[in-house]
Swiss-Prot record:
Its cofactor is heme b; Ca(2+). It is an enzyme of class 1 (oxidoreductase). It comes from Capsicum annuum. Keywords: Calcium, Heme, Hydrogen peroxide, Iron, Metal-binding, Oxidoreductase, Peroxidase, Secreted. This is Peroxidase 4.
Amino acid sequence: EMVALSGSHTIGQAR
């Protein structure tokens, strides 16, 4: 899973 915004699953979530 790759997050882009913060260190959580919010905006840039590519799962």
